Amino acid sequence: MYPVYGGNGITGYHSKYNVDRPTLVIGRVGFYCGSTHITEEFAWITDNAFITTFNEDNISIEWLKLLLDSLELRNRSSSTAQPVISGKTIYPILIPLPPLAEQYRIVSQIAEIMPFIDNLTQ
């Protein structure tokens, strides 16, 4: 069984998969729209999430997740009863692209300090 990813991470399991490598998904619909998740190697992604595609030779998936999280994409959702983010809203966003080695350094440093930040917020 493979995990099924919806708008806010794993929502269940299915006998089939539609991605065959870790994939960055962005919640598209609902209270958690704009949330990001990195899937397991084999997973099913519903239409409640965007599948990101990018050149893995130039972009670290972990760095891209951190960057998208910092953009607070939820704030770009429509203001309806059921929040929705459209591709038209997020596709034009320009992002800085440091060299791959710098992306890895950023991810490593953030991973190092997150336990301290988590302790401060508890």
Sequence positions of predicted segments:
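Polyanion-binding catalytic cores of nucleic-acid enzymes and NTP/SAM-utilizing transferases
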Residues: 1-2
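Amphipathic alpha-helical coiled-coil/heptad-repeat segments
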Residues: 92-122
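A short beta-sheet element
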Residues: 6-69, 74, 78-91
